[in-house]
Design a protein with these regions (language model features):
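PLP-dependent amino-acid enzyme catalytic core
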Residues: 1-318
Length: 318
């Protein structure tokens, strides 16, 4: 991933995205002894950073005249599917989205609202991805991965570019990891524009495919467990393009517990008035749970999404 790819992505998607706020968290700063700032991708269209990559992927393919673009298909835990459904609707392309059966209803409703064909009956994300790829082979549809796609990664990385434009002195970037698309792009930007910024990736304890794989020196399959951060679960594609940049560019990988996630999600709401879903609270959870040493540093933390069902949020805040 070149910085030029990210700059081109930003120009390409500019009419369709919003520049999201980058705000200081007094709560996390006081708690950690650092200057902690939140990149609120939770306020992006569709309330997720996934909007950026989805629009870049579709527009870039239209620019290149990609064959088989008459129909799109994807797999998603919810947010990518919602964003890609909006992009497909914008450009008049039919889309089929495969999701786990237990994906949050707020995400499923939004996917259907944009006119995509929704197949929400997979056992888990891994099965949804296998079925989406089989559908692509059977129908000739163009499969757009939510993470292992250069255009998706470049689009997501535009959020990191905004961070360094707002705060060039950022010396620690904390990023959640699901399939690795966001952190691959964000780390590429960080290393291209800064000589001092370290990058930390955050997974959940019950689904830490990349930490396990980096330690093994190769991609290994894990058995993911259920988590509040449903958007971060599952195994990456064995051929994912995100593993190599994570190995090369990410300085540290950490995991957070379910309690860390709950504490971060509740704290964001009560102290910072920021709503986040479980996956969206994973990076703040690493600060809350003291999984990384941030004392005295200028820290940028992604709040990557806010698509949480009302009942679940109410239960956490009760």
């Amino acid at each position: 991933m070149r910085l030029l790819d990210v700059l081109l992505a930003r120009r390409r998607i500019a009419p369709y995205v919003r520049r999201t706020p980058f705000v200081r968290s007094s709560w996390l700063s006081d708690l950690s002894g650092a200057e902690v700032w939140l990149k609120l991708e939770s306020t992006q269209h569709s309330h997720s950073f996934k909007w950026r990559g989805a629009f870049n992927a579709v527009i870039a393919r239209l620019e290149r005249g990609t064959p088989k673009l008459a129909r799109l298909v994807t797999a998603s835990a919810g947010n990518h599917g919602r964003a890609l459904a909006a992009a497909a609707e914008t450009f008049g392309l039919p889309l089929t989205v495969f999701t786990p059966a237990d994906a949050p209803q707020v995400k499923l409703t939004a996917i259907a609202r944009h006119g995509a064909e929704l197949r929400a009956d997979s056992r888990d994300y891994d099965e949804a991805e296998r079925r989406a790829k089989a559908f692509a082979s059977e129908t000739g549809a163009s499969f757009i991965s939510p993470y292992s796609d250069a255009d998706v990664i470049a689009g997501a990385a535009t959020a990191a570019l905004e961070i360094f434009e707002d705060a060039a002195d950022t010396d620690l970037l904390v990023v959640p990891i699901g399939g690795g698309g966001l952190i691959s792009g964000a780390a590429a930007v960080a290393k291209a524009v800064s000589t001092r910024c370290a990058v930390v990736g955050v997974e959940v304890e019950v689904s830490c495919a990349f930490l396990t794989s980096v330690r093994a020196g190769k991609l290994v399959e894990i058995v993911p467990g259920a988590s509040l951060a449903d958007g971060l679960g599952g195994n990456p594609d064995p051929d994912t393009i995100t593993f190599e940049p994570i190995q090369r560019l990410v300085d540290q990988l950490v995991t957070v517990s379910e309690q860390d996630l709950k504490d971060a999600l509740v704290g964001l709401v009560t102290a910072d008035h920021v709503i986040a879903e479980g996956a969206g609270a994973a990076a703040p959870a690493a600060v809350v749970g003291k999984r990384i040493n941030v004392t005295g540093r200028r820290v940028a933390v992604f709040v990557s999404g806010a698509n949480i069902d009302r009942a679940r949020l109410a239960a956490l805040l009760a």
